Every structure is written in C-alpha cells, then in structure tokens.
UniProtKB/Swiss-Prot annotation:
Gene responsible for this protein: ydiU
UniProt entry keywords in alphabetical sequence: ATP-binding, Magnesium, Manganese, Metal-binding, Nucleotide-binding, Nucleotidyltransferase, Transferase
Protein's recorded name: Protein nucleotidyltransferase YdiU
UniProt entry tagged with the keyword Metal-binding: yes
Family indicated by similarity: Belongs to the SELO family.
Amino acid sequence: MKATDNTTTGPGWNFDNSYARLPDYLYTRLDPTPVRAPQMAIFNSSLSDALGLATNTLAGDEGVAIFSGNRIPEGAQPICQAYAGHQFGYFTMLGDGRAHLLGEHITPTGQRFDIQLKGSGRTPFSRSGDGRAVLGPMLREYIISEAMHALGISTTRSLAVVTTGEPVYRETPLPGAILTRVAASHIRVGTFEYLAAQGNRDGIRTLAEYTIHRHFPELLQADNPFLALLQTVLEKQVELVVRWLHVGFIHGVMNTDNMALCGESIDYGPCAFMDSYDPDTVFSSIDQDGRYAFARQPAMAQWNVTRFAETLLPVLHDEGEKAVELANRSLATFPDIFQRLRMDGMRAKLGLFTKEDADMSLMQDLLTCMQQNQADYTNTLRDLALETLPDTPFFREPSFTAWHQRWQTRLTRQEEPVEASRALMRAHNPAFIPRNHRVEEALAAAQERHDFTVLEKLLEVLSRPYDDQPEHAEYRQPPPPSEKPYQTFCGT
C-alpha cells in the first residue's frame, strides 16, 4: 500500500496511518503514558538506516523522547488495537494492554511498517495489568528478533529499548523499559476472531479487504480473493514454522493472538532455542502440558489457521455449507505443503541437491540418533559439513557411524561435488544461535550491573550466524549440564 503523504519530518518519519482510517471498533485512540526519566538502553542503527530514518538524531535525546512515549512524532496517530485470541486453546477477548501503535512509517523505497511501543502504559485493554514492561523481557525480544532476522527468518524487528527510570512491580521491583517494535503489520488471527465473536460480518469483510490491499494485492485478481487470502496465510505459516524447526526455535506461546497474517514471527515471550535434540522440548513455565512443544508447532500452526478459516466463513461464500467446503479444501493442503517444505529444508541441511524416496528415513534416523544420545541440534548439523568430524562422543557412537555411512553413500549419488554440498550445508545450518545461557548472561549484566557490553557482543556474534567466526567459538558451546533444565517466562 502506497503512502498518501510523503512529507518527511526532521527525524525522518514518514507516517501514513491506514489502519487508523479503518472503523474505530478495531482500535482505541490513546497516547502513551509519559515516563519520568527515560534513557536509551540500546538503539538499532542499522535498522534505522534501513527504514530511512535520521539515525544520528534518533540515537540521541530526540529518539529517547519518542521511544519512551514522552513525545509523539509528527504525523503519528497513536492507537491501541483490539483483538481476541485462543490462549492455550481457550478463547478470550484481549487487545493491546500495554502497547501503542504510533503509526505506519513509509520507507524511501515505499515499504510500510508499523511502529509500535511496547510497555508504554495502560490502555482500555489492560484489564488488571499496569501497562508496563520490564527491562529483561524487552531486551530479550530485541536479542531474539534480531537473531531471527540474521538467520533469514521472517520476523518483527526491534528498533530500540529505553529504560523508563521507573520501577515495575512484579514479584519484586524491576527496572521498567519500553521496546520499539517494527512490524509489517500487527494484524493477527485474533483480530479476525475479535470481529467474529461480535458477529461483525461487515467488519470481517472490511478487515480482510484491508489485509489483502496491504499485504497481498496480487490476490485482488483471484476468483475468490478471501479464499486466496486463507490459502496464502496458510502457506506463509507453514513456511514460517518450517524455518523455526530448521533452527531449533520454540516459540512457546503460539496462541492465535500471536499469529500475524503477514507471516512474521511475533511476540517473543517464553521462546528459546533447543540445545540437545528432543522433539518434546518445552521451555515455557506456563506450558505445563507441552501444547507448544518443539514438534507440536506445525500442528498448532494448522490449528491456528483453522481458527482463521472459521472467521472467514461468512465472506468465503453466501451458502454456509459451500463456505465450509471451500475452507476445508484449503486447510487440507497444510500437511502436504509442510512435508514438502520440511523435506526441502532438511535436504539442504544435509547437503542434498536431489530427491530420493529414502530421504525421509535418512533425516528421521539422524534425528532419532541425536535424541537417543542427547546430541546438540545446532552443532551436530553444522559439524556435518566439516571435512573431518570433531572427535566427540556422539560422532563415535556406532549408531551415528552407521548413519554417517548411509549419508556418505547418498551424497555420492549426486553429480554435485562434495564441496558444493558442504557449502549448501553451511548456508542452511547456523554456527551460532542465541544460546539460552548466553542470553541470560547478557540480560543479567544489563539488569543487575547496567552493563550492556555483554549484550552488544552477543548481538555482534548473532548478526553473522552462518559465518564460522572461530574467534567467538565459545558462543557455540551448549550450556554446562549444571544449568539444565532451562525455563522461560512470559514477562507480562
């Protein structure tokens, strides 16, 4: 969607707030609550440059004032978005309880991005919450979202974190902070569920049309644009979850309000990256039943897309039975698309340029071997690309040795040279992920000692995840056994 006003202000903002022109039942107009003594904790200069902003200006007092909510930039129209969601399977009405969407910034190349403050004060959707956020979780989202971007995975980005100079009261007083999130949009499955719960058929049509115009204008040419929207959202979610699996990422809270229709990873609460391979891995303290465990993420994505399909039924077809038939036909494509993308990705991770029927068992047997021996997921796959395998207990295991011989034989049936396979593997198997103990180390230094050098060093390493970086080899190491099991928390 193109900007209607290309006026650029001093800091480089170029706001055109199309969502705020939608019916007001989708949001509430409200400014952020000012804070006492904001300071810049971290500022993403490279992202600022990419957005066409005046980086030098925003890195100083001007940025602190804007990113804290103390100053509304010219052209912004702050709103709090309404949405609902299925949280761990249970439906509830929600909304931005501690966030304000400043508006949509248009880059010099015509790209449109939401600029949202998170932790910016109470809203009509806050319920019993205080509308504030704690420094640790905001820095955590900054680290993980930027790492995901470097890994090549579609994600929201983090432009800045400011401290507020005010305590936030959880179990104990903690330093308050506000994150500035950059997203293609914040249209969620839960946004459609909010309208469906109210029986607002016209609202569903309006929001669906807006989503198509904003994100998928090519669908306007489809025979049934709303059905095409469902199929496109489904395919984007499959692709996203497959990419998560390939790097060992566990979102932790795949509620429908945390599924963005644009296909970006969003809301990095109790997320984490898997160390030793186990498909049942759960990190979130609130996921007691393992609903969002590593291997269950594809099924949960399909469940979420099904909830989206239900909201679209009134606009898919005038006849109810026909609408259900169309939706089910689209939803039925999920398993095959997932299997194809999953296998394509795993072939690349194993250096395979060609397809054979036995590739599925080759992949699964490796994962089973890794699980049985508690092998590190990231390091094992990365090290397979080496000419000589490291002398580790796992690589000496008879079960792995037998698998390795099968894999070597499979490689010989390709025309591509071995070095081409190794290059393919290095491009698809990161050497560096945000190791949980390294993330906690950086957060502790920032929160307890106000030392951001540990975090900055971690971000530097994570910005080049596919490079060997032998000088940073310690960042590849899994946590010592004494630090397991690792547990994450929501941070709300």
